[in-house]
Amino acid sequence: MIKLRLKRFGKKKEASFRIVACNSTSRRDGRPLQELGFYNPRTKETRLDTEALRIRLTQGAQPTDVVRTLLEKGGLLEKKVRPSIAIGKAKLEKEKIAKAKSKEAESDSKEAES
């Protein structure tokens, strides 16, 4: 299986990354099949080879989570709603509604006592 992942390079504590296509069993900094882009997390600079990335994605290459977010920002992939995020938002909304109801109940009970 071909993976799209980040390959680290640069000085110590000043890492930059190349976006590469490689075999899923190869090492992080091993020899890639193809270099597809560049990402610098300090300056947020991103360069993508869009044609080569589209070809690799149509061939079935699987991007890692970080590469997926970079491709979403670059417009190559649609933003995918991850289930854990959607569940977390729904849970927060339910908690807000429950708090509002409990505050209403407290204010009603205080008015009844007066």
From Swiss-Prot:
GO terms for biological process: translation. GO terms for molecular function: structural constituent of ribosome. Pfam families: Ribosomal_S16. PROSITE patterns: RIBOSOMAL_S16. The gene is rpsP. This is Small ribosomal subunit protein bS16. It comes from Prochlorococcus marinus subsp. pastoris (strain CCMP1986 / NIES-2087 / MED4). Keywords: Ribonucleoprotein, Ribosomal protein. Gene3D superfamilies: 3.30.1320.10. One of its GO terms (cellular component) is cytoplasm. The keyword Ribosomal protein applies. Belongs to the bacterial ribosomal protein bS16 family. InterPro entries: Ribosomal_bS16 (IPR000307), Ribosomal_bS16_CS (IPR020592), Ribosomal_bS16_dom_sf (IPR023803).
